[in-house]
Swiss-Prot record:
GO terms for biological process: Mo-molybdopterin cofactor biosynthetic process; molybdopterin cofactor metabolic process. Residues 635-780 form the MOSC domain. Its cofactor is pyridoxal 5'-phosphate. It comes from Drosophila yakuba. It catalyses: Mo-molybdopterin + L-cysteine + AH2 = thio-Mo-molybdopterin + L-alanine + A + H2O. It comes from the Eukaryota. This is Molybdenum cofactor sulfurase. The modification Phosphoserine is found at residue 734. The active site is at residue 413. SUPFAM superfamilies: MOSC N-terminal domain-like (SSF141673), PK beta-barrel domain-like (SSF50800), PLP-dependent transferases (SSF53383). GO terms for molecular function: lyase activity; molybdenum cofactor sulfurtransferase activity; molybdenum ion binding; pyridoxal phosphate binding. It is an enzyme of class 2 (transferase). Its EC number is 2.8.1.9.
Length: 780
């Protein structure tokens, strides 16, 4: 690993630090420059002084204001190494408004299509709603940048073509910092697209050929130009969209759309026009004439002239604090600086490991950090626990905030990049956004243990090496040297210091009761309670859990060791009946009421774990139904009628083998990494109480816990046998379940923990005779 080499001299760094002294005063580390960079202190002071010196008013009134605006247009063109001969500058509110302007005014002709890259800002997805294209297509990044550029090609408009197609992509992905090679622009302008992409709208089944259309490029440069030079002499997109606060930090509310001469030829003013865009418009007739000057036709209404004038100090500040050298321009030096920091951080993150050798972070990038022309100053990642489970990005945001570190979490208004880097298929997207209810900007960070977003840190010219070190130290101290419960306690104790949205996230840090599983008939399938459902408790455990069992002709309890088909009997608890189902059409019901059952039943005795159990025979009808479906003669269904106590501590038990409840941590199940669906693996362990702590095997350290205020003591781990090798949905055996647990537990067959409800001496908790899915789990 190469050592970090600073781009700026000590004197330059000192001048920069002096301009951002407020960070030190506030004990803040700012690492969200892809969201917005920071303004220098003298920058805003100089901008204010300029307003105080001059009378800057509406440009329609004051020529001085118009001169200032023209200066800024010239400076923008110079900044991108081009001139007014090649590009027009249209001021907009931001990059989003620039993209909207392109969508509204681009002339697709009769056959033109709209194409966009999957890894794009949400605003590009919004363009789909406004374009008047023949078809709309999504392209993966490789489909855009994967081809070879023809040599000596010429961009031109070929006669006979009937439409204009538009491709929009980001010069730099704001999620990962990946940069699409800019020579892709000319390639597509010359050759078109080899593949149109996935069709989202339009006439299906059409054979799209490049010969029908000319191709134009709209470059979303907002993330790219904040820290990288864009040379419009070398690369000539037809449209460039940007926001100036990304570059300067101040002012906000002003962006630009740069339109090439080629792009202007297919730009047509649509429907609306505002003040300043026309030569005249009659109120008494549908007659108007637009301005001759191109940019004036599209700058509806009064420009944000004070903000535009403030841009001059932004340019001056960059040139003052990061002066060009004989070798590199200002923006090239900034690019080198942020890339160097990102490369150092990525190198350090790769070295962070848990004591068992598992990596602390999972990084999201395409080409690594070897070439700044392909990767910018952004690092995206998620944190993993020692067992490999993901830590929710909302928790990372809380911990970072309490350490004074400002970073970004989520999908960063780039759901397509989230989909790509997190490997989310269409069903997973529906699970996250439609079924689980996540919305953009929330802290709903894990669904079934899988992340719905990531952590992003991004750098600007004022970011220091020490800032990166503080982030690394926070990760080391919080996630390598601290146990999860200690970390949660730390966050909860400091929660009042957090902003409102993160305070809400603190409430989600504690694990919750996800599901309860009642097994009315011993060794048969579960009846499940989930989605905020409640279930009553008795002094033996969950009501109706293991109250029935099937015995053979010798009176011995039948288990899945002898008959795996037992798992195919599905009990359903109804208002007054227990319905047993086998397959789609076969079912039989017995009374839920013990009194009703006792009236028509004979008493009998069986054994569970060598202990005698008093029971009631449920009759010949259900006995015959069981024998027919399971293919065994002489089966009977018994219901427990007498009290059964544990031989160990006299706790009251149903027909369970060892304890009142078996608790399972879904994170532990997830660590097995079986190919079958996670819920199928959970079913193998036949637990009553399912939680998800985010940290595998954490439950093995518990001594006591409470669920929704109900106290439990831990009896110990559940020692597993080959019963867990049976798939509870098919009855098929697969031995890898047991061997995997043995490997993870170093030869021990422990999975899940037995817990027992702690008796209460008073009746003050009578209201707590139910547990509800969603109850908070507190560990002692």
């Amino acid at each position: 690993m190469a050592p970090y080499r600073p781009e700026f001299s000590a004197a330059e760094q000192s001048r920069i630090d002096a301009e951002f002294s407020r960070l030190a005063r506030n004990k803040s580390v700012y690492l969200d420059h892809a969201g917005t960079t920071l303004y220098a202190e003298n920058q805003v002071t100089a901008a204010a002084e300029q307003l105080q010196r001059n009378v800057i008013c509406n440009p329609h009134t004051c020529r001085l204001t118009g001169d200032f605006v023209d200066q800024v247009r010239f400076k923008i063109l110079e900044f991108f190494n081009t001139t007014a001969e090649d590009y027009h500058v249209i001021f907009t509110a931001n990059a989003t408004a620039a993209l909207s302007l392109v969508a509204e005014n681009f002339d697709f002709g009769s056959t033109g299509d709209f194409h966009f890259c999957q890894e794009n800002h949400t605003s590009v997805l919004g363009m789909r709603e406004r374009v008047r294209a023949n078809g709309i297509y999504m392209l993966k990044e490789k489909e855009i940048s994967g081809g070879e550029l023809k040599k000596n090609g010429t961009v031109h408009k070929v006669s006979g073509k009937t439409g204009n197609s538009l491709l929009t992509f980001s010069a730099q992905c704001n999620f990962s910092g990946y940069k699409i090679p800019l020579d892709t622009i000319e390639k597509i302008q010359i050759d078109g697209l080899s593949k149109p992409g996935k069709q989202l709208w339009g006439s299906l089944g059409e054979n799209k050929e490049n010969t029908h259309n000319d191709y134009y490029i709209c470059l979303d440069a907002a993330s790219f130009v904040a820290t990288s030079p864009l040379d419009l002499k070398k690369y000539r997109p037809d449209y460039v969209c940007l926001s100036f606060y990304k570059i300067f930090g101040y002012p906000t509310g002003v962006g630009a759309l740069l339109v090439s001469r080629r792009g202007a030829d297919v730009f047509q003013k649509r429907r609306f026009f505002g003040g300043g865009t026309i030569n005249y418009a009659y109120p008494h007739a549908m007659d108007y004439q637009l301005r001759e000057t191109f940019h004036q036709r599209y700058e509806d209404g009064t420009l944000p002239f004070l903000a535009i004038v403030g841009l001059l100090e932004g340019f001056r500040t960059l040139e003052r604090l990061v002066p060009k050298t004989d070798e590199f321009s200002t923006m090239e030096r900034i690019s080198r600086h942020v890339f160097g920091l990102a490369k150092y951080l990525e190198d350090q993150l790769r070295q962070l490991q848990h004591p068992n050798g598992e990596p602390l972070v999972e990084l999201y990038n395409k080409v690594g950090y070897q070439d700044k022309s392909r990767q910018g100053g952004i690092v995206a990642f998620n944190v993993r626990t020692e067992s490999g489970s993901f830590v929710g990005f909302g928790e990372i945001a809380c911990v970072a905030a309490l350490h004074g570190i400002l970073l970004r979490t989520g999908c960063f208004c780039n759901i397509g990049a989230c989909q790509y880097y997190l490997n989310l298929d269409e069903d997973a997207m529906d699970t996250i956004y439609k079924r689980a209810g996540r919305i953009c900007g929330d802290y709903f960070d894990l669904v079934d243990g899988q992340p719905t977003g990531a952590v992003r840190v991004s750098f600007g010219y004022m970011t220091t090496f020490q800032d990166v070190e503080q982030l690394l130290q926070m990760l080391r101290s919080s996630y390598l040297a601290t146990k999860p419960l200690q970390r949660i306690q730390f966050i909860e104790e400091q929660a009042e210091q957090l902003p409102p949205l993160l305070k809400e996230r603190v409430q989600l840090l504690r694990p919750k009761l996800l599901q309860m599983a009642i097994y009315p008939v011993k060794s048969c399938a579960a009846f499940k309670i989930e989605l905020e459902g409640s279930w009553p408790l008795t002094d033996q455990g969950l009501r109706y859990d293991r109250e029935w069992m099937i015995v053979d002709m010798n009176g011995m309890a039948l288990t899945q060791k002898r008959c795996t088909e037992l798992c195919l009997i599905r009990p359903v608890i109804k208002v007054d009946q227990l319905e047993l189902q086998f397959g789609d059409n076969s079912h039989f019901s017995v009374p839920l009421s013990l009194e009703d059952q006792a009236a028509d039943s004979a008493k009998c005795v069986s054994k569970v774990c060598r202990q005698p159990v008093e029971g009631l025979d449920c009759g010949d009808g259900v006995a015959q139904w069981l024998s027919e479906n399971l293919g065994l003669e002489g089966l009977r269904l018994l219901r427990q009628s007498g009290q059964r106590n544990s031989s160990k501590d006299q706790q009251k038990l149903s027909l369970v083998n060892q304890a009142q409840f078996l608790l399972l941590n879904k994170s532990s199940v997830r660590s097995l990494q079986f190919e079958e669906p996670l819920d199928e693996t959970v079913d193998r362990f036949r637990a009553n109480i399912i939680i998800d702590t985010g940290s595998a095997f954490e439950e093995l350290t518990y001594k006591a816990l409470s669920i929704g205020g109900i106290q439990f003591q831990v009896e110990g781990p559940c020692q597993r046998c080959d019963m867990i090798c049976i798939n509870q949905r098919t009855g098929e055996r697969s031995p890898e379940t047991l061997t995997t647990i043995s490997r993870l537990q170093k030869g021990r067959m422990r999975f899940g923990i037995y817990i027992t409800r702690i008796p209460q001496d008073t009746k003050e908790l009578e209201a707590k005779e139910h547990m509800t899915c969603g109850d908070v789990v507190l560990v002692e």
